[in-house]
Amino acid sequence: MEEFKDQVVVVTGGSRGMGKEIVLAFAERGAHVVIASRKIEACEMLAEEVRLRFGVRALPVACNVSDWDQCGELVDAAYAEFGQVHVLVNNAGLSPHYPSLVDVTEPLFDKTIAVNLRGPFRLAALVGHKMVESGGGSIVNIGSVEAIRPSHMALPYAAAKAGLHVLTEGFAQAYAPTVRVNTIQPGPFLTDIADNWAEGAREELEAVVALGRCAEPAEVVGAVLFFSGSASSYSTGALLRVDGGWR
């Protein structure tokens, strides 16, 4: 519980779902948090909650990670406030629906790639570079089982998450030995994305995982803490499946 005390953790997509649970977990352990998402009001509400509950500092930042410049502004804001970042969690994601593959539009495709791949690239590049200068840190990417078990109804998303695996390997080599970069690959989680699943989708997913159920958002926390701290000191460029035993 003391390992992350007074460390600075940046979480994208941090105001809800898995991101919110990650923020709460680090704040409970004494870390100061930068909560980034598109909607500043939600970030501000969560920031106030963690200040009151855990007595840590919290910086809410409006950031659309698909915007190259906004990624830079997020990093600038974090370092202006805290002077250092110890952990970056690239959690923000987007998996839009479409009626069929032929109906995927260029804007939908580009937006999906931008949120799920371009944003994590830019943030890892900027923060990882600064981590090297300051002596080290950990970058944790949130991927998806879609990267290895793609559905035809989420192909742009799956392709972006597969690209995230490549970024993980590449950044792990680029910023070694002081910065570690790893990816968590969740299976079906009951986040906001699940609210838009088609009728019967949850039952279909639960039928193909060994544990027989979808995960709650907080069930990603253990893996994130593992990759962020000393327990994974010899892990970099690694991929950890948190998918309930996807068959």
Regions inferred by a protein language model and the residue ranges of each:
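Conserved glycine-rich cofactor-binding loop
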Residues: 8, 15-17
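The beta1-alpha1 cofactor-binding region of Rossmann-like NAD(H)/NADP(H)-dependent oxidoreductases
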Residues: 40, 62-74, 106, 218
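Short C-terminal tail/terminal secondary-structure segment
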Residues: 95-98, 149, 225, 236-247
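Substrate-binding pocket helix/loop in short-chain dehydrogenase/reductase
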Residues: 99-101, 105-113, 139, 194, ...
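Active-site helix of classical SDR
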Residues: 124, 160, 168
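Alpha-helical segment proximal to the catalytic Tyr-Lys
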Residues: 129, 172-177, 233
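Residue(s) in the substrate-gating loop at a strand-loop-helix junction
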Residues: 144
